[in-house]
Design a protein with these regions (language model features):
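N-terminal disorder-to-order initiation segments that are Gly/Lys/Arg-biased
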Residues: 1-66, 103, 110-141
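Short, acidic/charged, Gly/Pro-enriched secondary-structure junctions
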Residues: 70-109
């Protein structure tokens, strides 16, 4: 039997936000024991995108042993992630609660549950956005 996966970099706290348009509510969940990595990508002259264009990207890893997906939290595209313990946000504040306006905030574009030997081991989530706050831009552009 293989040794269990270790997550030495998963020592951060994040806050998840999920909007429910039908109920006009925002669900806020604080999760500890995660790895939240942000990075900046700039396009040089001669690349496939306009020279000087930039995007910010993030990768989030949530070990199942720290928080169980679907039980302790939910996460899906269009949700938002804040580095650290984030503020309470009302539904009327949601449209202004964007990565372009709030430092430390990221917009989720994908969520992928990873398994080993048929058991969930961690969830990966990520996304990217430009200075204007728009997302879903290919990092290969």
């Amino acid at each position: 039997m293989a040794a269990p996966l270790q997550y030495p970099l998963c020592c951060q706290t994040v806050t998840f936000y999920h909007a429910d348009p039908a109920a006009h509510t925002i669900t806020r969940t604080v999760v500890q024991g995660v790895h939240f990595d942000t990075r900046r990508r700039e396009t040089a002259a001669g690349g496939s995108g306009p020279a000087g264009s930039a995007a910010t990207a993030f990768l989030l890893v949530i070990p199942e042993k720290h928080a169980a997906f679907g039980r302790d939290y939910t996460l899906e595209p269009h949700d938002r992630v804040f580095a650290g313990t984030g503020p309470e946000v009302s539904y009327t504040q949601w449209l202004d609660f964007t990565p372009a306006k709030v430092p430390g905030l990221a917009a989720v574009q994908y969520v992928d549950c990873k398994t080993a030997a048929g058991q969930a081991v961690h969830v990966e989530a990520g996304g990217w956005w430009t200075r204007s706050g728009s997302g879903a831009h290919s990092l290969s552009n």
